[in-house]
Amino acid sequence: MAKIISYDEEARQGMLEGLDKLANTVKVTLGPKGRNVVLDKTYGAPTITNDGVSIAKEIDLEDPYERIGAELVKEVAKKTDDVAGDGTTTATVLAQSLVHEGLKNVVAGSNPIALRRGIEKATEVIVKELVAAAKDVETKDQIAATATISAADPEVGEKIAEALDKVGQDGVVTVEDNNRFGLDLDFTEGMRFDKGYIAPYFVTNADDQTAVLEDPYILLTSGKVSSQQDIVHVAELVMKTGKPLLIIAEDVDGEALPTLILNNIRGTFKSCAVKAPGFGDRRKAMLQDMAILTGAQVVSDELGLKLESVDTSVLGHAKKVIVSKDETTIVQGAGSKEDIDARVAQIRAEIENTDSDYDREKLQERLAKLAGGVAVIKVGAATEVEAKERKHRIEDAVRNAKAAIEEGLLPGGGVALVQAAAKAEKTEAVTSLTGEEATGAAIVFRAIEAPIKQIAENAGVSGDVVINTVRSLPDGEGFNAATDTYEDLLAAGVTDPVKVTRSALQNAASIAGLFLTTEAVVANKPEPKSAAPAAGADMGY
């Protein structure tokens, strides 16, 4: 494909127009009185949302230079969303403000590299001030407050606080459609996976068609269990103990399956066979998770273990196992806490290192099953469009609440940024800057006011008046846009997680630095649209 190249001011101006188009669309959603944006879809109903990253992803501009500028800001929103789960609109507003302030100086002749260094140094000092000002989350009410701010719905805040209180920080809170109007909250006890019994003959409870095994042994194998010889040895070992047996394998078929079923029906030996979840490497990883949770060893050729020669030391144990047609739940596995903690740490490290959203989601599910639990918030609404919008808000609020638990809380409404910047300006790390690095730092201190101004303007109040008033207030006090009052924001429950505020500033500063130091842009040349073919003479009917 042919390329077009532009340089210097022309390059930056085209990118700036794209940045502004995206940022101006996103920033109308900021704050408690922010508006929604309607996103048209090729198929199905449109989506109505106030989620910055969802809006940014939908914007695809025609002009190649504008598209590049918009893509840079999309990266700010996406990176902030990946790290913190919220703060995407704040990050976008900060990036726009930093770029505009910076370009004024570049046009006036400042060295972009020196400006970038100043921006980075000022950002680093402000982040330290934000972290130092953090307040730990100590109560369920604080979690509810921060989730309420994110979702703009007190009922959602309460449900999320209840869910996280039950499943813990590492637990998974999923959001699903509800057939009924309103919000419902369900919890899963223990490790649950989406595979049920291989045959209905294993059912022990006819009323709800489940197989319930009390205090069972658990056999985990990565291969198929097919021959009678495969199963008889293990069955005889377990029968001597008088306990039931759960078999989780790639498959149970051949002579092995009818052998288990017949013994089950006759009451000789109680058991249940289940297919292992997942495929390939993910199946192996999930089997290993189960092994650690239950204190078992996975029987596999790779480890040199054969079913016909194993003893009870390779079998796992649990207080109870409940198996339905579609899923299996292992309650209170007998694995050691040290082994489980080590596995949890390993999965956390994998989450940090993966670039794939899909892999990250699957790893987080595995983490929850090992370390916490699973809560499901079911959302029902009058229309499909309203339900989709509400689900978006709840998903954001869940991640916001988890970020608050992880790194603590700050006063919300953009106030924490302004007050941290005021302290940072007086530190030696900033006052010792000279020349154009000092100019770069000054760019950050001016741009940092953008979120609070935008929140005020979306609430119908002058941003400049709010900024001047907030500067004169004690730490922690600021403008509550929901009530149009100045008050102690932490006490009023107007809070932001440190992780969200910090990530928004760091990602905005990073992209702004790249933007200012851009001197040439190489873009794909737009292909001319082909004219529609003319109708033939015989097409007139």
UniProtKB/Swiss-Prot annotation:
Transmembrane annotation, as ranges: none
Subcellular location: Cytoplasm
One Pfam family per UniProt: Cpn60_TCP1
Keywords assigned: ATP-binding, Chaperone, Cytoplasm, Isomerase, Nucleotide-binding
Broad class of enzyme this protein falls into: isomerase
GO BP terms: protein refolding
Keyword Metal-binding part of the UniProt annotation: no
EC number: 5.6.1.7
Protein residues bound to ATP: T29, L30, G31, P32, D86, G87, T88, T89, T90, G413, N480, A481, A482, D496
Gene Ontology molecular functions: ATP binding; ATP-dependent protein folding chaperone; isomerase activity; unfolded protein binding
Catalytic activities: ATP + H2O + a folded polypeptide = ADP + phosphate + an unfolded polypeptide
GO cellular component: cytoplasm
UniProt xrefs under PROSITE patterns: CHAPERONINS_CPN60
Chain's role: Together with its co-chaperonin GroES, plays an essential role in assisting protein folding. The GroEL-GroES system forms a nano-cage that allows encapsulation of the non-native substrate proteins and provides a physical environment optimized to promote and accelerate protein folding.
The protein's assembly and partners: Forms a cylinder of 14 subunits composed of two heptameric rings stacked back-to-back. Interacts with the co-chaperonin GroES.
Family: Belongs to the chaperonin (HSP60) family.
PANTHER family: 60 KDA HEAT SHOCK PROTEIN, MITOCHONDRIAL
Protein name, as recorded: Chaperonin GroEL
Source organism of the structure: Bifidobacterium longum (strain NCC 2705)
Gene expressing this chain: groEL
